[in-house]
Amino acid sequence: MGDPKRQRKKYETPSHPWIKERLDRERVLMKKYALKNKKELWRHETQLKEFRRRARRLLAARGKQAEIERAQLLQRLNRLGLLPADAVLDDVLSLTVEDVLDRRLQTIVFKKGLARTIRQARQLIVHGHIEVNGQIIRSPGYLVLKEEEDTITYSKTSPFAKESHPERMVIEQAKQGEAS
């Protein structure tokens, strides 16, 4: 039977734990995006570091394989909605952690108006009220692809799917209040 794949952390912790500027920046992001803990933030920061590391390596590389990898990296970031279709590798270096956090399912559910607050968006996702592309996703940190963005709705089995649900009426009234 082969050995199981080794479990690895998907995030890197900060090199120094008590840098005030970093702590203040993290606190603002934690509140704005309603993250559960710093680990969620560090996971997305590590993802961004990896994209940037690959871009720096590919900027210096020459050859046919480097061209293929450049195209693959840009295509991946385009599918995630982090970069436009006509982006170049220098655009990867200008990405910020906010760009990645804006692609989380939790943030998109809130911005689409399916929840009143970003915290309620997290609760709706965890409780299985939200589906993406016909599939219930229970992970608020799921990075939504650009083509999946239009398929985010309430789950068919969720009470929120009914227009007459009391909470949904409150959300609709809040939307109309903002529009006026």
From Swiss-Prot:
GO terms for cellular component: small ribosomal subunit. GO terms for biological process: ribosomal small subunit biogenesis; translation. The keyword Ribonucleoprotein applies. Disulfide bonds: none annotated. One of its GO terms (molecular function) is rRNA binding. The keyword NAD does not apply. Residues 103-165 form the S4 RNA-binding domain. It comes from the Archaea. Keywords: Ribonucleoprotein, Ribosomal protein, RNA-binding, rRNA-binding. Residues 159-180 are annotated as: Disordered. SMART domains: Ribosomal_S4, S4. Belongs to the universal ribosomal protein uS4 family. Part of the 30S ribosomal subunit. Contacts protein S5. The interaction surface between S4 and S5 is involved in control of translational fidelity. One of the primary rRNA binding proteins, it binds directly to 16S rRNA where it nucleates assembly of the body of the 30S subunit. With S5 and S12 plays an important role in translational accuracy. NCBIfam families: PRK04051.1 (NF003139), uS4_arch (TIGR01018). This is Small ribosomal subunit protein uS4. It comes from Thermococcus onnurineus (strain NA1).
